[in-house]
Amino acid sequence: MFQEEIAKQLSVLTEIEANKILECIESTKNKDMADFAVPIPKLNKFKKLVGKPDQLAIDFASKIQLNDCIQGASATGNYLNFKVNRLLQVQEILKEVINQKEKYGMTEQGKGKKVIVEFSSPNIAKPFHAGHLRSTIIGNFMVNLFNELAYETVSMNYLGDWGKQYGLLAVGFEKYGSEEELLADPIKHLYNVYVQINGEAEKEEEAKKKYAEEIAAGVEPTAPLQTTPTIHDTARAYFKRMEDGDAEALAIWKRFRDLSIVKYKDIYNRLNVKFDIYAGESLVTEGMTIEFKKLQDKNLLEDSQGAKVIDLSKPNKLGKVLVQKTDGTTLYITRDIAAAVDRKNNIGFDKMYYVVASQQDFHFRQLFDILGKMDYQWQKDLTHINYGMVKGMSTRKGTVVFLEDILNKTQKKMLKIMKQNEQKFAEIEDPEKVADIVGLSAVVIQDFNAKRNKDYDFNWDRMLKSDGDTGPYLQYAHARLCSLERKSGFEFNPNANLSLLSEPEAFNLAITIGRYPEIIQLTHNQLEPSTLVGYLFELAHAVSSAHQVLWIKDREKDVAEARFVLYWAAKVILGSGLRILGLVPLERM
């Protein structure tokens, strides 16, 4: 309503279409100075305005017609500022939330567009550890956001389920495997087997190296040279059998894969994550043959001591990329090429996002460059969503921490904190479930507090606090709003007299609620969860300030009903934001 009025008047003054001017209107942070502002230079992208921006701002301010909506116009540098009817603004915001409820702030901008989000993607032979947490929750946040904005969204888990390490795993399982332990916890057991066999293989390699050094130095070797195939040789041969379609080798590999996926799904359920497709490197073997031939036909392959490489040194200085080993087996990037083509042909997409750590930046630059050289025009529709590392996640001995252990530990710690308030604890229907949700909220919000591309320090004590900017604090704010509704003695009245919300705290809370659509757009444009998290903390703080003075209990009915609507709207928006972040908003805690 207010932005539309501003756009309408500016359209007359500039002869720029009102809907284009709407894109340039910003909500201000300093409400004492203005409620909305238009940076005049931004208008130049639609039409070259004659005159200096600061002079134009002064000129436009003098010509704005004041009315029920616009109550003041002024210029500050290149900005044209507007003061609006705040009482009317509060009413309009709350009426929109009443009408749209959880859909407030959401648009249908994604209608008719299909996106694939590939995320989480653990390696079956390696632990599902804390490092996978960021990819999993960032990808889940993106899927939730895209769904809210009407995109057709495909969530994909591209399992690392192919490569020489599976040969190594098969060799290791034959030697160290336990059926009982495999069925009890396939992920942990396969990891332990992998560590054991890999350690043994490394000792063999060290012995070979030592033998060669002793011979070169002309001394008697301390141990004879191993003449039987090494563990790595056996693993390579096993993987070659897999690539050649050997039924026995594939049956063992498939069993490891299937059991691992069942366990992964348990963990994903706790994380509130669901995948439409469980894909994997193994599923693109046929496509690899076709794409490899295309690389040959386009003369992109070069021989390098029996292996095949692609030269990407010009123009982007991306070096030479190995795409086939001397024994004819493929590499990760070869499978990524085939996977991208397969998805475009068989699923289709307008955009595809890879949510993978920033250590893989160079890999994705190489992948996208190769696809471009193969003349795949849709290569421009691929985006690598990178992120920094989580520090402080290893044990004191430097060993890896499993993600499930982190979730169990946060749940246990949260349960202990909850038990400190016996009265509230007794009111909770399923305390273990609630502790799990609050624990997950602590982990997720600590992660999302940091900018996506930054490293951050994992801090158990800080993240579990119910005060300060933490996950438990946001859940507490939501639960408190639910409690206020239950205990107020009033019902939600959509026709409440909202003109009674005249206090500064009511204005501040309503205006914060009204910023949600803008925040959603900013979050979508940046694909940055910290933007949404920062806003939710602002909203929770505004609610807390309002609680101090805007009471409902024992107030006059009309005033109480208006305040009830204000708090109800805050609850709707807070809940909406938490759900986009992948969290279940709690009603009691």
From Swiss-Prot:
Domain of life where this protein originates: Eukaryota
Q: Which GO terms describe its cellular component?
A: cytosol; mitochondrion; phagocytic vesicle
Spell out the SMART domains in the cross-references.
Arg_tRNA_synt_N, DALR_1
Motif: 'HIGH' region; annotated at 121-132
Q: Which UniProt keywords apply?
A: Aminoacyl-tRNA synthetase, ATP-binding, Cytoplasm, Ligase, Nucleotide-binding, Protein biosynthesis
Task: Please name the PROSITE patterns in this protein's record.
Answer: AA_TRNA_LIGASE_I
| Physiological role | Forms part of a macromolecular complex that catalyzes the attachment of specific amino acids to cognate tRNAs during protein synthesis.
- Family according to the record: Belongs to the class-I aminoacyl-tRNA synthetase family.
Question: What name does this protein carry?
Answer: Probable arginine--tRNA ligase, cytoplasmic
Q: Which organism is it from?
A: Dictyostelium discoideum
